[in-house]
């Protein structure tokens, strides 16, 4: 999870740092609604994905909506069609902000209460971590990525957590998003090959409108 300064400098130069959404783009999206197909999803995730398409906030790029409350994510084609859905493992601690400077710290120094998956809108791109793995970098500055599930510590039971029917046991990581390896290879990697994309991580503590200030649910004239 710890990031080399050279990687951070490159990421900042490419504009890959995460941030809070402040305004939608001016161009119209191809679809007025996101198409979840037969995938079950919360009303909040559906409404948010619909807003992405109606506002064109994804700028014609592939996008992911991560529902932290339900510990699941949805990968969409640029036109709003669902490419795939999966359970996900998230940061051990509840919370919507990363601790300042956490990307510079060694894993051993990160306390349990600091292991959060931040909420927000992030421009994401495929790349390599500090080893040899390919990952989807979500926030370089805070060393948050989406990657294949880590199975090097059997005691953490990460595969079992992903397979369980409840999101209650999906909190185990230092903040990164873990998905099944097959899902990463078949859905995430092809979606982001040759292109950047947007990752939206919905908050679990802060109000949705406090993170995405331009968001308006369908049929509403007020910020949620």
Which stretches of residues belong to each language-model region?
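Sec/Tat signal peptide C-region and signal peptidase I cleavage site
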Residues: 22-30
């Amino acid at each position: 999870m710890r990031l080399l300064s050279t990687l951070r400098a490159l990421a900042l130069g490419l504009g890959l740092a995460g941030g809070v959404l402040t305004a939608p783009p001016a161009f119209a999206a191809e679809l007025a609604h996101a198409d979840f197909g037969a995938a079950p999803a919360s009303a909040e995730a559906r409404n948010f994905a619909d807003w992405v398409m109606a506002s064109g906030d994804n700028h014609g790029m592939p996008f992911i909506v991560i529902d932290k409350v339900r510990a699941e994510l949805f990968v969409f084609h640029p036109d709003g069609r669902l490419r795939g859905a999966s359970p996900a493992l998230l940061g051990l601690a509840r919370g919507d902000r990363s601790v300042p400077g956490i990307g510079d710290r060694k894993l051993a120094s990160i306390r349990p209460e600091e292991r959060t998956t931040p909420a927000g809108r992030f421009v994401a791109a495929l790349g390599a971590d500090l080893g040899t793995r390919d990952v989807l970098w979500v926030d370089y500055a805070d060393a948050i990525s989406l990657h294949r599930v880590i199975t090097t510590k059997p005691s953490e039971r990460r595969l079992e957590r992903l397979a369980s029917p409840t999101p209650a046991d999906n909190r185990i990581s230092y903040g990164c998003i873990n998905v099944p390896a097959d899902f990463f290879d078949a859905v995430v990697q092809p979606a982001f090959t040759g292109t950047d994309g947007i990752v939206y991580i919905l908050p679990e503590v802060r109000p949705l409108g406090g993170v995405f200030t331009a968001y308006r649910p369908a049929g509403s004239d007020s910020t949620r």
